[in-house]
């Protein structure tokens, strides 16, 4: 995967994910810092006139779902599931939010989403390199498994009960749905609670990454 966003390149470099760097000799403080780090780490730097500053990084390595579950259990933490979310920028923004609030990991469906691309990496501000990300075949089955392990499970939906009216206990898992399709019915059926974020304006919903932030902040308050 080729990255052109300097912030994402720096985060990938610090995590040892950069294979090589390309540039045409342009300099600014951020690029100079990245080049210095690359030299110290022994990352090859290729200079070519007209070449946009970029970095080739190794593919995102997905974590095992069981690893994230164990991490949430032992740390009394929470997991973010993204159901029917296909826009790479939204995926990246949600991953950034999850990492910021200390989630044990993020879970994506194997179908429809595909692999994480540059748009998600950029929107995550490099958070994709700092938080475990897993992919599973069936969200409903995964949620069912978590319930048996003692997780509180939540699905976000406009027709749900108010978030503030629900008693939240950790470990927990929250499922955020795509803006077009939302959380699928089988997944909602498996969750302990179907909840919404109450608002007072004329617009009846939030961008999914904003909604994810509110849910995860609420859960993080139970832990920290």
Curated annotation (Swiss-Prot):
This is Uncharacterized tRNA/rRNA methyltransferase AF_2399. It comes from Archaeoglobus fulgidus (strain ATCC 49558 / DSM 4304 / JCM 9628 / NBRC 100126 / VC-16). GO terms for cellular component: cytosol. Belongs to the class IV-like SAM-binding methyltransferase superfamily. RNA methyltransferase TrmH family. Coiled coil: none annotated. It is an enzyme of class 2 (transferase). Signal peptide: none annotated. Keywords: Methyltransferase, Transferase. The keyword Transferase applies. PANTHER family: 23S RRNA (GUANOSINE-2'-O-)-METHYLTRANSFERASE RLMB. The keyword Transferase applies.
């Amino acid at each position: 995967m080729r990255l052109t966003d300097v912030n994402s390149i720096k985060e990938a470099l610090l995590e040892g994910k950069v294979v090589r760097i390309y540039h045409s000799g342009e300099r600014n403080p951020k690029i100079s810092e990245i080049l210095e780090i690359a030299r110290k780490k022994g990352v090859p730097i290729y200079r070519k006139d007209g070449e946009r500053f970029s970095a080739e990084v190794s593919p995102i390595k997905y974590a095992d779902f069981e690893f994230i579950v164990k991490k949430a259990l032992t740390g009394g933490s929470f997991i973010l599931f993204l159901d029917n979310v296909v826009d790479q920028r939204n995926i990246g923004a949600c991953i950034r939010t999850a990492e910021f609030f200390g989630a044990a990991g993020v879970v994506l469906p194997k179908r429809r989403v595909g692999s994480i691309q540059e748009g998600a990496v950029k929107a995550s501000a490099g958070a994709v390199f700092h938080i475990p990300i897993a992919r599973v075949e069936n969200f409903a089955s995964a949620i069912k498994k978590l319930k048996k392990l003692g997780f509180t499970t939540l699905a976000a939906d406009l027709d749900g009960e108010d978030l503030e009216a629900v008693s939240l206990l950790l470990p927990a898992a929250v499922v955020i749905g795509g803006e077009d399709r939302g959380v699928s019915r089988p997944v909602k059926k498996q969750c302990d609670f179907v909840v919404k974020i109450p608002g007072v304006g004329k617009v009846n919903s939030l961008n999914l990454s904003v909604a994810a932030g509110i849910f995860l902040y609420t859960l993080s308050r139970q832990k920290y």
